[in-house]
Amino acid sequence: MYLIFIIMFGYRRFIKFVFPFPATGIYFHGYTFPIGKLPSDLQLWKVFRRMIKYNGDHYLVALPILMLQPSMYVCTYVCKEVDIEKESRGERERTKKLKLFEIVLYYLSVCTPYWWNITAKFFIPFSHSSP
């Protein structure tokens, strides 16, 4: 489904559609993109290449994981402030909230494949009628 969406609408719209985070910037595997300024195709290719590298050394192993289990890489797509050098109290609180958001996304990304496994074990026996 994600692959069809990417083919039809392109990478940029896919990223804006799947990850609509309200923040000044999006931090994604070492790349910071300002909101409102879409990254170029070359930047996106670098990001996806780096993402594949983190999920597995072999492209053929990593691509099915990325397409079939999006929760495995949602945890790495975290919005952060572009300028966190200011020492005001509000920005420190915002940074703490973002760190908490990071932890929640990591927890969801780790648990979701297990939930999918449990769900598959529960529903697959009922989907096939016994002879």
Swiss-Prot record:
Listed GO CC annotations: membrane
Bilayer-spanning residue ranges: 13-35, 60-79, 100-119
Membrane topology reported for the UniProt record: Multi-pass membrane protein
Principal location class: membrane
Keywords associated with the record: Membrane, Transmembrane, Transmembrane helix
Compartment(s) of residence: Membrane
Note: Partially overlaps UIP4.
Protein name (database record): Putative uncharacterized protein YPL185W
